Amino acid sequence: MDKLLERFLHYVSLDTQSKSGVRQVPSTEGQWKLLRLLKQQLEEMGLVNITLSEKGTLMATLPANVEGDIPAIGFISHVDTSPDFSGKNVNPQIVENYRGGDIALGIGDEVLSPVMFPVLHQLLGQTLITTDGKTLLGADDKAGVAEIMTALAVLKGNPIPHGEIKVAFTPDEEVGKGAKHFDVEEFGAQWAYTVDGGGVGELEFENFNAASVNIKIVGNNVHPGTAKGVMVNALSLAARIHAEVPADEAPETTEGYEGFYHLASMKGTVDRAEMHYIIHDFDRKQFEARKRKMMEIAKKVGKGLHPDCYIELVIEDSYYNMREKVVEHPHILDIAQQAMRDCHITPEMKPIRGGTDGAQLSFMGLPCPNLFTGGYNYHGKHEFVTLEGMEKAVQVIVRIAELTGKRGQ
C-alpha cells in the first residue's frame, strides 16, 4: 500500500528515543532528524501551511477537494520512542505468512512466543515486523506516523472526497511533554484523532488520570558500630513507605478499569534516598484519594524523626481522563466506529491504561480519541506490528476523512 512498509522501516531506522528529566523540548536531537524528514516529505507531497515550531511540533494541511461547510479534522502521532528500552540501531525482522510457534529474535535465545503473548494465535498468515531482540521496534508511534503519511498519499492521489485535513507530529509524548507546546488554535481542527493505539479495531476515548509522586528522604549516617539512637537509615524509611502502599494495587495485579500505584524507580544510601511513583486511576475521586493516601503514608513514616531528617513528597498531576471532554461530541466516536465497520473491522472500545497526547489536547479544546495502529507489546524487545494491521489503520483514516467530507455536503 503506497510505500507503507518502506516508510515505516525508514522511520524506525532513526533513533528518536526521548529522555526524561530534560528541560528542552524535544529532549533529543534524533527527534529533530525525523521531524525534518517528515517536513520534507510533506512538502514533496504538496501539503500546505507546513510549520515546524521551535518546540518540535510539525503541522501541515491537506486542502479540501469538495465544497461545503465541512469541519476540518486532524490526525496526530508522536515521533519519539520510549526511554524504557533502547531505540538505537533498530534492526527489524519481517516474518511473512506467520505460521505459529516461537519467532526467534535475532541470533540468540530471545523469542517472541505465543505462550507469553497469546495474541499471536490470532495473527496466523499475517506479516509480522519484529525486533532482533536488542532494541524496541518503535511502532509506538512510528507505525502511526507511517499510517498518517500513507493515508495522506492515498487521499492526495485518488479522487476521494474530503474536507480540510490537518496533521501533526509531536515530540516527547513518552515523557509527557509533547502536547504541552501544541498550539490548538494554529492547528485549526474541530476535532482530531491520535493514531497511537494497539491492535486492530481499538478505539479509545478513556484514559487514566495520572500523577507523579517524587519522594525525597533525608536520613543520618554514622558508623554502624555506634549507630544506636543516632542513625536514621533513609533506605529503611523508603522500604517502610513502600510497605504501606497497597501491594494488590500495582500494575502487575490490576487490569481493565482498576487503578494502581507504581513504584517506577528507587535509589539511595543510608544518608539519602529517592522514590518515584506513578499514580493512575480512571475515576477522578479515586485518583484524588490515591494522592491523599501517599501523603498520609509519608506523614506516618516521617513522624517523630530528628529535625534534621525528613521526608519530602511532591505530587504533580500529569494528565486527566479525556472521557468527559470526548463524550460531549459523540459524533467523533460515531464516525470512527462507522469507518471501521465500513472497512470490515469490529470496533473495540476499551480504556487506555496509560495516556496519549490526545488526553491533554482534549482538555486544551481539541477533542481527540485514539485509533489503533496494529502494534503490540510496546516499550520493549518483544514489540511488533502487523503489516495488515497498519494497512487497516490507513484504510480507517481515509474512510474517516471521507465520511467527514460527506457531513457538510
Curated annotation (Swiss-Prot):
It is found in: Cytoplasm. The keyword Metal-binding applies. Its cofactor is Zn(2+). Its EC number is 3.4.11.4. Binds 2 Zn(2+) ions per subunit. Keywords: Aminopeptidase, Cytoplasm, Hydrolase, Metal-binding, Metalloprotease, Protease, Zinc. Transmembrane segments: none annotated. It comes from the Bacteria. Zn(2+) 1 binds at H78, D140, D196. One of its GO terms (molecular function) is zinc ion binding. Zn(2+) 2 binds at D140, E174, H379. The active site is at D80, E173. GO terms for biological process: peptide catabolic process; proteolysis. InterPro entries: ArgE/DapE_CS (IPR001261), Bact_exopeptidase_dim_dom (IPR036264), Peptidase_M20 (IPR002933), Peptidase_M20_dimer (IPR011650), Peptidase_M20B (IPR010161). It is an enzyme of class 3 (hydrolase). It catalyses: Release of the N-terminal residue from a tripeptide. GO terms for cellular component: cytosol. Belongs to the peptidase M20B family. Cleaves the N-terminal amino acid of tripeptides. This is Peptidase T. It comes from Salmonella typhi. The gene is pepT.
